[in-house]
Design a protein with these regions (language model features):
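Hydrophobic positions on the long internal alpha-helix
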Residues: 66-69, 85, 118-122, 126, ...
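Substrate-binding pocket helix/loop in short-chain dehydrogenase/reductase
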Residues: 95-96, 103-107, 130
Length: 155
């Protein structure tokens, strides 16, 4: 499919996940996709070889990594981003009383502060394109399950 001239950056595009599926869907619709992964070995092979797809290494917990991703997208798009999909996230399944506080902080950093940091960093490109943001969430907010209390409080 020819390019629409629109771009999307999706965090958390490791093989087999929702992000990889979203990246493939956007690519098929004609978007230039910036599919991000922390570990390049986990990038889906079908995306690595697809036209209009750029695999970016991005650790959403690192300000330096986020800044490097902004620079890469800016150079490739002329300073525009049409869609940002904050998809990175994680949960911990265990009783709250067994949760290590440091692990809980890391979970909260990943699920709350990281999407906010990515949004703030890409905001100028989104504003320039009159773009939009999609923040991936979970059914866990509506469907209580045992041993997910720490996940429920991290947006």
């Amino acid at each position: 499919m020819p390019s629409l001239g629109k771009s999307v950056l999706i965090t958390g595009c490791s093989a087999g996940g929702i992000g990889a599926g979203l990246a493939e869907a956007f690519q098929k619709k004609g978007y230039h996709v910036f599919a991000t992964v922390r570990n390049p070995a986990k990038a889906p092979p079908n995306l690595s070889e697809a036209p209009h797809v750029t695999i970016l290494i991005l650790d959403v917990l690192s300000a330096e990594s986020i800044a490097a991703a902004v620079d890469s997208v800016t150079k490739e798009t002329g300073g525009r981003l049409d869609v940002l999909v904050n998809n990175s996230g994680q949960n911990l399944v265990m009783p709250a009383l067994d949760l290590n506080i440091e692990d809980g902080r890391k979970l909260f950093d990943l699920n709350f502060f990281a999407p906010l940091a990515v949004l703030q960093a890409f905001a100028p490109l989104l504003v320039e394109a009159r773009g939009c943001v999609v923040n991936q969430s979970s059914a866990a907010g509506y469907l209580p399950m045992p041993f997910l209390s720490q996940y429920y409080i991290s947006p």
